[in-house]
């Protein structure tokens, strides 16, 4: 039976974050608010949990799960060949609605799907998400919806779709933004905008003037 906590209530927030952290450590799924849409998350290093996440969404391994982190410093242990331009994007837009696709450390013991040696990583601008990520470490997080359905902007919508496949729901009210993050590939010499989202190409070009845009 799924448990739900109102993170706008101080007592519920404390209890909910504790229960969510425990659930993640047990390899279970949680739903959490972010600065874009609600996400469904699992321990990034627990293969079975990531598999459960993909199954709950009805999503295949060909659509690997992004990773959310609670601090830019966490990148040092996750990625390799991270350029100066990539760090400048981090400095300018994190925490926030920018996802960076980077090469992950080959020694990492995780299975996020068919990533081809890369990871899509982001630090969200949401206090509840950051508090949970700081407590449990990197999480595999995808939008908390069934594949093909709209990404949820509130906890009700997420729970209506995902039900008891999730152990803990953290209800932070409506999300402050309903536009997905922008995605930039920083594995290339010149970063490539793969998806224009909450951050426009014009804003990104203030940091990376030569930014290319995918067709």
Label each region the model flagged.
Residues 1-215:
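Active-site-adjacent structural elements in enzyme catalytic cores
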């Amino acid at each position: 039976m799924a448990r739900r906590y109102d993170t706008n209530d101080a007592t519920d927030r404390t209890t909910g974050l504790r229960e969510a952290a425990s659930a993640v450590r047990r390899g279970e799924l949680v739903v959490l608010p972010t600065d874009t849409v609600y996400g469904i998350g699992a321990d990034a290093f627990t293969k079975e949990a990531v598999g459960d996440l993909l199954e709950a969404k009805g999503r295949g391994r060909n659509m690997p799960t992004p990773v959310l982190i609670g601090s830019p410093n966490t990148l040092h242990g996750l990625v390799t060949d991270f350029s100066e331009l990539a760090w400048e994007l981090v400095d300018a837009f994190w925490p926030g609605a920018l996802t960076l696709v980077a090469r992950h450390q080959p020694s990492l013991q995780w299975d996020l799907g068919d990533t081809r040696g890369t990871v899509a990583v982001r630090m969200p601008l949401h206090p509840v998400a950051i508090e949970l990520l700081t407590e449990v470490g990197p999480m595999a997080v995808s939008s908390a919806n069934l594949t093909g359905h709209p990404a949820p902007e509130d906890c009700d919508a997420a729970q209506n779709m995902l039900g008891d496949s999730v152990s803990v729901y953290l209800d932070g009210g409506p999300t402050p933004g309903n536009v997905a993050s922008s995605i930039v590939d920083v594995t290339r010499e010149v970063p490539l905008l793969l998806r224009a989202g909450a951050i426009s190409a014009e804003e990104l070009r203030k940091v990376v003037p030569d930014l290319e845009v995918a067709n």
